[in-house]
Amino acid sequence: MKIQKMKIPAILGALLLAGTLSAGAQMNSDSLYKEPYRPQYHFSPEKGWIGDPSGFMYYQGKYHMYWWGKVESTDLVHYQQITPYAMTGTDDNISYFTGSAVIDKNNTAGFGKGAYVAAYTVFEKDSKKQAQGISFSHDGKTFHYYEGNPVLDLWSTEFRDPTVSGTSRPKIG
């Protein structure tokens, strides 16, 4: 009789745990932002960590913020995640660290007038060397890896976080 009494709470506990895990697995994007400990006012990505947010700019009525991904906002309270991975190349031996982005209104980089140009750290996993690379976009969402990367290479293990500026400086407030 003792064995049966112990089995019932164990079975109920297992069912309760399974139901909880199942409900958690079915979370949608609306419920993500109601999670405990998730910032409710400042931006946080749907999954993963944001690292160093960079490439913040105001352009054509929207705030644009880049990290490894991209979000847009019209009021700095409500955000639309555009992509979780904005800047990537095709080499699996390369990781990308943050940098900055700018709108090239005068086509000084040669990617087209009004192109988004992102500068970031290119990290070679095997050698641990860091260099600076760029990607460009004509819509601010789909970036093209510049085939001439790296654009600055000191062959150093400590060469991170480039900052670019231009005619489109960040506007806050």
Describe the predicted segments one by one.
Residues 11-20:
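Bacterial N-terminal signal peptides
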Residues 2-12:
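Bacterial N-terminal signal peptides that target proteins for export
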Residues 22-24:
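Sec/Tat signal peptide C-region and signal peptidase I cleavage site
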Residues 26-173:
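Beta-rich carbohydrate-recognition and catalytic domains
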